[in-house]
């Protein structure tokens, strides 16, 4: 009988398990994952960038404290592959006024950002002189915002860090075991098969897995894109849906190599570049390449073995990418992969909630799970431990229920 | 080319279409439904009760104005089968304090409710003297609340009323046609197959159906339990999920007949009775019977042809029902049916929102669609017509975006 069973050994699950063990060393904690090791689900398929600068309080709080923790780990000598290359938002005219307002707010608050007027934008785009681009309806870039407290990280090292610390502290793991459902038992059994019935008070008893049942007093689902199907089947409705995501890798050779090494604001490498129409270009210095993706309005749904689609590159990304950054002309990806976002379809923020006695969920990170994993893990651990408050890295304290599904957050204005 | 195409001829869809036509008589409006007539989906499977008394503002506003409209229709001579039999909440001790607080608030506000102390509760229950009930963990009833502005209605007549008025006003309908998907077209076509691509500005062009494409400038999905699968496929995430619901019908013969005719507060028939553990007993005077259901924590999911499950009656309802109302002992349902709720899994309120240019949704009524259909229809019509405000029955004005998916409502405290 485990005290806490965490389903999912991705960034959120491992951070949660680590923080449970840290806060309650004598508890018996188990992490179960269907993969043969940690971080092999969608954590490994992340675009793995981070920033701490957002307009909404909740984004800022989760990302800033998490990234602060990662930085401390990195500075302590455990290399997480963090590089503070920055984010460069290339902003079309239609959004210029909004972006200027956001930038001025940030600058006033002392945030390290830089606003470039059209003529000073450090990445040359040719949309304004290109007739085809105009026919395609692609907007000219009229201003750019460089966000400096931002960069890239290696999610596999991050999750491995949590895993090592967790195991050191006596945490247990079970890999290659798939959790199939959550089990409840009646608080007052009456001895009739089929219990618990709808009218019986019940609490979590454990989970059914591909390797048989596991008993636990508390189960925390940190199951990302798998969350919807597991919780639907258990009768707990969450506004979290899986959505396919794809990343295409282009070698940074020739002039693209120069672009890769053209860091801004004294950084060694190019920033994460956010183009209009949801396309992003992420530097990958170790592999001398760029990772490219797009936030497309794709159907929701889960694919058992998601594969990257050449068509998305060809029709969804390439035509726009090459208009804004002509250096990519003629390039084709030499690698690509696909995974899932676990998207909160209401406010795109994670949900950490208690769904029933002994049943918790920590999911819905909506594409920013890596940069928020530490805070989400601390909140999930505190909630599962029955603490009213969660202490985030750096000492900031939030309500453990801050991410419950019925919360209300302001809308983020600085989005990809 | 239609100006407005409403998908779904249930209560919400027909109310929406009727109000569009009422507010914009010259618009060409079409209602499409897969069934051979109006109200043949989940509208016909509703428990079809109404109340106007809630603790939350939004529940009160939607139900009170809608029921006010139905009452006016009924009083004008168009029989909607409304009977103001009331709702009787039988409250277990664990909820007594909350219910007393709610009741005192309501009484202070001049709401027609009546609170019965244990000895005066007009329905005799025997839980307190029953050892088996105690072993089952069933709580004794310690107080009861009678809500008078409440009762039952015939949803098929209601939807027929809207249908007749809509057709009279020149509205068009297409039955037996299943809408399969929503179609978009690029605002600036470039003439390449596969348009619109993710980076193109697009707007609704119409729908694909089992009978071929239909063109429309605006499409409103009033698709209840079908909403999730249709909108998931279109890439629009909503916190709305289908959940099976079942109603069991028991003949009101012998002493049950006396119970049926034992109206409270001068009403002719028994009230809708809400037992502990989510079981409700609805009088059906026309058929001399009771409709019985339970809000069970059932898995989410859609069934193509949902059937009632004898097991739910036998293990989920009967053991509890007979403990609270022993008159049901030995009774078996002579009829039953199953349908779906379209449940908003966050706040159990309807969502009326604009998802893209020309694309609207009006769904998620979560089991109170009949009693809120008029207000939801007025809000959906106003939003689709581009009006900032919606005028509800009785002259109350709300923002047309009041039910957008990112709203924040207080939690309802008076629930089944």
Outline where the language-model segments fall.
Chain A
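Beta1/beta-strand and adjacent pyrophosphate-binding region of the FAD-binding site
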Residues: 1-12, 30
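Short hydrophobic core segments
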Residues: 5-7, 32, 207, 214-226, ...
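Conserved Rossmann-like nucleotide-cofactor binding loop
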Residues: 12, 37, 226
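Active-site substrate-recognition segment that forms the wall
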Residues: 18-23, 50-51, 78-86, 197, ...
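Glycine-rich FAD pyrophosphate-binding loop
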Residues: 21-42
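Dinucleotide-binding Rossmann-like beta1-alpha1 core, especially the glycine-rich loop
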Residues: 47-132, 278
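Flavin (FAD/FMN) cofactor-binding and adjacent substrate-gating region
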Residues: 94-202
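Flavin (FAD/FMN) cofactor-binding core of flavoprotein oxidoreductases
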Residues: 117-127, 311-388, 393-414
